[in-house]
Amino acid sequence: MLNDEIIEKFLEDKRLEGRASGTIQEYCFRLMELKQYLETVETPIDSLTGNTITNFVRFLRRKGQKAQTIKNKLSTLSVFEKWALKEGLVSSTVVSPDYYPKSTETKRIRRLSDTELRVFKSYLDTLQENARAAFYLMMGTGCRVGEATHLRVSDVSLRGKSVYVDIKDAKWGSDRCIPITDKKAAQIVWRYCEGVEIDTRPLFRLSKRTIQGYATTFAQKTGITFRCHLLRHTYAALLTEQGVPMPTIQYLLGHKSLGMTAHYTQSAITDLKDLTPEI
């Protein structure tokens, strides 16, 4: 059976390969869920079949999980199977893209409108200094909320007259050192950093859940559909509108592929007047 000892050995090997802590944590959560499922259906890890995978997908669907979430979990299982094959724990691998669920809807992700951004910035002015600075950091870098809340004071530095943020242990190994590209955001974050006490606590002294709570409050107060991740989409879209090359945006966001970056930039407001002939 798939047990805790096998999972821990897999995770340790992935740590030695240099996988980010966030990736290791995701692997752990997903494999523990698989372990519980296999125990329920009394199936050893070395006896997986296509039918097992199909039923696992149905199980996740019944729990209300989205196609992309299930795809990510099967991807983790595929990585685990390849490792288990090398370790001699299984004689063959089963998971393939053929088992990945197909998404039945393609939503166009919108960015915050200019008016909504102004309303949001007014809301930020009512928050405590640390929360205000955290949101401006996300607006000025496009970083994930988890990346912002894990920063330390030493991760923010001044290079010349530009403010840089060193993001470490990021999701999917997307560590990067990036500038705060918005002037006002850079000024607010740096002013906060200059006044904050240097100790072992996170830079903003806030949890991911607390930041998300502020986002929920904003949505409830204004009626604007909002969540923290929308700032990341908005950042990418605004850079696209400014003509920033896609590979540059890919690096700033920490994406592995241009395809993912394109998904984030699709809400850019495109000016077609130069392409539109007059008659």
Where are these regions (language model features)?
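N-terminal core-binding DNA-recognition domain of tyrosine recombinases/integrases
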Residues: 4-108, 123
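Active-site-proximal segment of tyrosine recombinases
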Residues: 147-148, 226-227, 236, 243-257, ...
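Basic, Lys/Arg- and aromatic-enriched nucleic-acid-binding interface segment
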Residues: 114-145
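Short, charged phosphate-coordinating catalytic segments
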Residues: 138-161, 247
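DNA breakage-rejoining catalytic core of tyrosine-based enzymes
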Residues: 90-92, 103-119, 172-183, 198-202
